[in-house]
Design a protein with these regions (language model features):
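Sec-dependent N-terminal signal peptides
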Residues: 4-16
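Extracellular/periplasmic catalytic domains that process cell-envelope and extracellular macromolecules
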Residues: 18-19, 78-82, 94-96
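Cleaved targeting-peptide boundary
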Residues: 19-25
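Glycine- and acidic-residue-enriched helix-capping/strand-helix junction motifs
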Residues: 30-44
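A short, glycine/acidic-enriched catalytic loop
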Residues: 38-41, 67, 92-106
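Functional beta-strand-loop-alpha-helix junction segments that form "active/interaction loops"
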Residues: 43, 47-83
Length: 106
């Protein structure tokens, strides 16, 4: 988590003139198989840290596939050349044939 905050601070220092800072934070822990103990806590912690850095944060907790897709679509629709956007995900993910996939709770 400290590494992420360091990266975020560096990113922000490069974007001090951006008009708006928005973030999408997704925390998935309530999986039927192999639940994650800390993913939701991590998402909540990063949300608090980003809000202290003047980000307008959308926190999505324990999202199924539809909710994740909708949240990502809505987030991307808010981005423009004057916006600093940050995406953070805590939950299961896999890599398949060199592509990374985020795993919803269902």
């Amino acid at each position: 988590m400290n590494k992420l905050l360091t990266i975020a601070l560096i990113f922000l220092s490069l974007s001090t003139f951006a008009q708006e800072r928005i973030a999408l934070v997704i925390g998935n822990s309530d999986y039927q198989v192999s639940a994650l103990k800390n993913a939701l806590n991590d998402a909540q912690d990063i949300t608090k840290a980003l809000e202290e850095l003047d980000f307008r944060v959308t926190l999505v907790e324990n999202a199924d596939k539809r909710v994740m897709k909708d949240a990502i679509y809505e987030f991307s629709a808010k981005l423009n050349k004057d916006t600093v956007g940050l995406f953070y995900y805590a939950g299961h993910a896999v890599q398949y044939h060199g592509e990374n996939y985020l795993i919803p709770i269902n």
